[in-house]
Amino acid sequence: MRPNLLAAAIAVPLSLLAAQIAQAGEGMWVPQQLPEIAGPLKKAGLKLSPQQISDLTGDPMGAVVALGGCTASFVSPNGLVVTNHHCAYGAIQLNSTAENNLIKNGFNAPTTADEVSAGPNARVFVLDEITDVTKDAKAAIAAAGDDALARTKALEAFEKKLIADCEAEAGFRCRLYSFSGGNTYRLFKNLEIKDVRLAYAPPGSVGKFGGDIDNWMWPRHTGDFAFYRAYVGKDGKPAAFSKDNVPYQPKHWLKFADQPLGAGDFVMVAGYPGSTNRYALAAEFDNTAQWTYPTIARHYKNQIAMVEAAGKQNADIQVKYAATMAGWNNTSKNYDGQLEGFKRIDAAGQKLREEAAVLGWLKGQGAKGQPALDAHAKLLDLLEQSKATRDRDLTLALFNNTAMLGSATQLYRLSIEREKPNAERESGYQERDLPAIEGGLKQLERRYVAAMDRQLQEYWLNEYIKLPADQRVAAVDAWLGGNDAAAVKRALDRLAGTKLGSTEERLKWFAADRKAFEASNDPAIQYAVAVMPTLLKLEQERKTRAGENLAARPVYLQALADYKKSQGEFVYPDANLSLRITFGNVMGYAPKDGMEYTPFTTLEGVVAKETGQDPFDSPKALLDAVAAKRYGGLEDKRIGSVPVNYLSDLDITGGNSGSPVLDAHGKLVGLAFDGNWESVSSNWVFDPKMTRMIAVDGRYLRWIMQEVYPAPQLLKEMNVGK
């Protein structure tokens, strides 16, 4: 999920880092900063040189890859990639049927010939180069003058040209990242591997043990890991899926640690964290806490209940909506945890006090501080503008995101954009984007059931007719033809006649021109044609606000950074899906008075949670192996068993899932897959006492592959077999 560049995560300029007081735990450091914080890294226990881990194409960093929403790493010279089970969940679900349910049973390819495609849109991105383009980006924006919409379009044009030049070399995918709300811009160039195959996934009763009950919780006992393999053409260059392709040979791959990890040991994570908001305005925080999180969580829970009920009657729904449900569950529980955490640490009060101090400092500077004060006022005004239509915007977006309407609106928009020169098309509809659009159309039926889609459409139409008059959309009202349950039923009955449920039909429209859409009698396409002018108008309004933000946000954030520097504080960029490193130590925590959590869980803890019912229904092979104390030489004598999961004080967020956890020597000791319940609010206000990362221990991964769901071929490939 790609965040809008123009609303990229708020951060502070890296040049203002006060490295001398940086410490382990808090901080998502860009690799270029690592030599500056060499002291804290060494103090925490790093044995490698900071210069070595800041070499992004060397060992070990060159082994870390992005999946587009998750992180992974190469673990063999033959293109084997390890990530989280939940990151591979979509691929597992895509290859599952009610009769052959890989989600439940697992997948273990005996040979590379038996590996299956992870889907047409599965990707492995291997970082090749990072270039600072701040000067050119700012010049392009400045040339647009005072017109807000022109500023947005100027940045878009700059980005498109920059990316087109970067991607002139075949096989690469490039992306422009904004830091500090527009104070810094960097271009990332990645090798784009397009043939990704599922090699191994443990049964769901291992990979998702504890399910949504244990999600975000400690103690934890989840084997959250899976393996892909990256393939390329025989010439070694990226190519679409083909039986003739061969495994990719990375320059670097991670080796499993040969020293046992213990409490207090140094660990670090390299990955692609999605978004944090630690430098957001207090009012922006308040809007999120009071409306955004509660509202989205409520809608997701309602939809979860709908799909669960339907799934009990239809196994096809249960399988096809598994990945969607996992996402809804994860997000809604995360938001609940953040809201609880906000209250526990008085996040609202902290944000208000911090902002009051900054504003007071600026006022004390007289004329020098006025531009930042004006920028702050402008940001508040922009927030109020967005709040005025937030219910409409959310409802319309999620209604249009249901399967058939999502396909119809995307396809019609594509036909409109195709009338323009490629450089002038909206991002997401350029020639570079067509394979992803086509891939999504091809795999939609594996995640769609008509009866379920109708229920979801009905849910959002019922939400729409509840909107106040000033938030209604004339085009939708005209299409709906009423404001009651009868009108909703008529609309649903019309939409049921769409033919877009067929892959063949969707691909036909993928190649159609605009006139064909506007002459169509398909009800989903007719809806898209009816509402598109309004959608385009609303998009222009958002871009105008984004242009205002481009002028105000960097000014205020620069002032915020200056204030922090004056107070002797260190600063680091908010997460924005770019490569980051976080470091710290293995340690437990005390969630409540009189309660102390140790940092490791064990095999015996898995058995203690066993109920025989989902989600605590371990495979018989696991229970038998634990009962026989068949540890396979992987036990840690300090805890008397094989460690399953462990805690550390590292700073991660969504997007870090699947990130390799490295020890002091750069060896693999596990995979990041979650945070504890008390940590989720740290996306906004970091709490060092409570924030902990949860990782699956590398020894548990190996134990499962050795004793429970054997994959000797992969263990041998990773040079860790018996």
From Swiss-Prot:
Known uses: Designing engineered forms of this protein with the ability to produce custom dipeptides potentially may have a number of commercial and industrial uses including food industry. Maybe useful for drug design.
Catalytic residue list: 86 (charge relay system), 224 (charge relay system), 657 (charge relay system)
Disulfide bonds: 70-87, 166-174
Signal peptide limits: 1-24
Thermal dependence of catalysis: Optimum temperature is approximately 30 degrees Celsius for the hydrolysis of Gly-Phe-pNA. Stable at a temperature below 20 degrees Celsius for 30 minutes.
Regulation: Completely inhibited by the serine protease inhibitor diisopropyl fluorophosphate (DFP) and potently inhibited by 0.5 mM ZnCl(2), 10 mM o-phenanthlorine, phenylmethanesulfonyl fluoride (PMSF) and N-tosyl-L-phenyl-alanyl chloromethyl ketone (TPCK), but not by N-tosyl-L-lysyl chloromethyl ketone (TLCK). Activity is not affected significantly by protease inhibitors, such as chymostatin, leupeptin, N-ethylmaleimide (NEM), iodoacetate (IAA), L-trans-epoxysuccinyl-leucylamido(4-guanido)butane (E64) and pepstatin A or by CoCl(2), CaCl(2) and EDTA.
Any one GO BP annotation for this protein: proteolysis involved in protein catabolic process
Substitution effect: residue 214 to N: Decreased enzymatic activity to 3.0 percent relative to wild-type
InterPro entries attached to this UniProt entry: Pep_S46 (IPR019500), Peptidase_S1_PA (IPR009003), Peptidase_S1_PA_chymotrypsin (IPR043504)
Stated pH dependence: Optimum pH is 8 for the hydrolysis of Gly-Phe-pNA.
Binding site for substrate: 215-216, 330, 655-657, 673-674
Keywords: Aminopeptidase, Disulfide bond, Hydrolase, Protease, Signal
Substitution effect: residue 224 to A: Decreased enzymatic activity to 0.026 percent relative to wild-type. Loss of enzymatic activity
EC number: 3.4.14.-
One Gene Ontology molecular-function label: dipeptidyl-peptidase activity
Outcome (variant: residue 214 to A): Decreased enzymatic activity to 1.5 percent relative to wild-type
Effect of residue 330 to A: Loss of enzymatic activity
Coiled coil (residue ranges): none
Domain of life: Bacteria
Protein role: Exopeptidase that catalyzes the removal of dipeptide units (NH2-P2-P1-) from the free amino termini of oligopeptides and small proteins. Peptide digestion is sequential and substrate recognition is non-specific, with the exception that Pro is not suitable as a P1 residue. Removes many residues of bioactive oligopeptides such as angiotensin I and neuromedin N and also cleaves oxidized insulin B chain. Able to hydrolyze an X-Pro bond, an imido bond. No endopeptidase activity. May play a physiological role in feeding.
Subunit (UniProt): Homodimer.
UniProt free text on domains: The chymotrypsin fold (25-276 and 574-722) is the catalytic domain and the alpha-helical domain (277-573) is the regulatory domain necessary for exopeptidase activity.
Name this protein carries in UniProt: Dipeptidyl aminopeptidase BII
Originating organism: Pseudoxanthomonas mexicana
Lineage: Bacteria, Pseudomonadati, Pseudomonadota, Gammaproteobacteria, Lysobacterales
